[in-house]
Amino acid sequence: MTHDGTWSDESDWEAVEFELDEAAHAPPAPVVAVVGRPNVGKSTLVNRILGRREAVVQDVPGVTRDRVSYDALWTGRRFVVQDTGGWEPDAKGLQQLVAEQASVAMRTADAVILVVDALVGATTADEAAARILLRSGKPVFLAANKVDSDKAEADAAMLWSLGLGEPHPISAMHGRGVADLLDEVLAALPEVSEVAPRPGGPRRVALVGKPNVGKSSLLNKLAGDQRSVVHDVAGTTVDPVDSLIELGDRVWRFVDTAGLRRKVGQASGHEFYASVRTHSAIDAAEVVIVLIDASAPLTEQDQRVLSMVIEAGRALVLAFNKWDLVDEDRRELLEREIDRELVQLRWAQRVNISAKTGRAVAKLVPAMETALASWDTRIATGPLNSWLKEVVAATPPPVRGGKQPRILFATQAAARPPTFVLFTTGFLEAGYRRFLERRLREAFGFEGTPIRINVRVREKRGARRR
């Protein structure tokens, strides 16, 4: 290392780049879904598996959240935990919702843990979920929760009646039996996820948005008017999942179209479950079309869906539907309003359409192609650091704690979405990272894709020796 704190040769950077490249190209980790009725301890079990308090722990009415998947590590193996809890219980719709939960888990997970309250015993909702999971052909593990003593294990034994094999007595709250359960789950998991989308084949598109925004109408317009549906692909015994549609001389795979075509019942909790399906579709997609009602003000629900797409790191197309309902003299004003409200998403591809009349629907294809090309983009290390040197020389990072952090080196760690790592001598303020993102877009494009900028602060030499 030289006197100014930079590395004297490139070997350190090459080692880090190799490490990042390995991580970026790692095969998708297997997925374990945790399902069950409210109040049985799903989120507590997820937290226990993660070893940190991250999932919501009260499955009580009104407790919902957007994020449902977490990276986990057990005995050196990476896997993903999918928490499907969080919807509001209601006696009328409970069985239907647990069954729906199990159905989604069958499609999106490599193995399933069904959590049952051993003190309550098997309910009709538990039985409905068990029947669906048995048909999946996937490894299913029955976690008999709230077994806090040897005496309570007798309650767990009663759950043999569900037909899922031996119940695993656990206490998610205190950790009892969870390690043994995880050992068995991981032994049954494939090394690489069998449900993760495979590279190659038609590009995968998710069509998402709040209820009644016109998703089904747009899907039917894309498929029906052009008579271009190739076929529906059977995903499970429950419903067909994807549709292959030919648009613009290529075939696109629209994911989870079953969720669009089937009307969700009015049972309590269906709005949360729509959120789970939205997550499922976004996770399976490469590019996401978010439908927004142009004839009504932007809602919190619209913003929440957009946040899901950004967090998932998917290419994005904004489709403002029902544009035909907007008065001609108001359209320019509305465009400016949208610019103001979505100022952080100026990079997104935007198309004003009418799913009903077909207005501008054809423009969705070039928008998707542009977004995906940006999503796939990689910038070589040399040009990236030349650009960075010029930007930092003109506008250095702000002083923090009396010291000015220096950016030593940058590399693109991954594409899909483009992810950059900056090696620095100190923390970079969020505002400066946003500034760098804007400049990155000005220099290299990236229309239609989120960009991630991560910072690695160099350790002090004394700290490293200790």
Curated annotation (Swiss-Prot):
* Protein residues bound to GTP 2: 209-216, 256-260, 321-324
Q: Which Gene3D superfamilies match?
A: 3.30.300.20, P-loop containing nucleotide triphosphate hydrolases
* Gene Ontology biological process terms from the UniProt entry: ribosome biogenesis
GO MF terms here are: ATP hydrolysis activity; GTP binding; ribosome binding
May I ask which residue range the UniProt record assigns to the signal sequence? none
Domain EngA-type G, which positions? Answer: 30-193, 203-376
Pfam families annotated for this entry? KH_dom-like, MMR_HSR1
The UniProt record lists the KH-like domain at 377-459
Tell me yes or no: is Ribosomal protein among this UniProt entry's keywords: no
Q: Which PROSITE patterns match?
A: G_ENGA (PS51712)
Arranged from A to Z, the UniProt key words for this protein are: GTP-binding, Nucleotide-binding, Repeat, Ribosome biogenesis
The domain of life for this entry's organism is Bacteria
The family database entries (SMART domains) matched by this protein are listed as: AAA
Tell me the residue numbers annotated for binding GTP 1. 36-43, 83-87, 145-148
State the SUPFAM superfamilies in the record. P-loop containing nucleoside triphosphate hydrolases
Task: Summarize subunit and interaction data from the UniProt record for this chain.
Answer: Associates with the 50S ribosomal subunit.
**According to its UniProt record, which protein family does this protein belong to?**
Belongs to the TRAFAC class TrmE-Era-EngA-EngB-Septin-like GTPase superfamily. EngA (Der) GTPase family.
Q: Which HAMAP family match?
A: GTPase_Der (MF_00195)
Protein's job: GTPase that plays an essential role in the late steps of ribosome biogenesis.
Name of this chain's protein: GTPase Der
Organism of provenance: Mycolicibacterium paratuberculosis (strain ATCC BAA-968 / K-10)
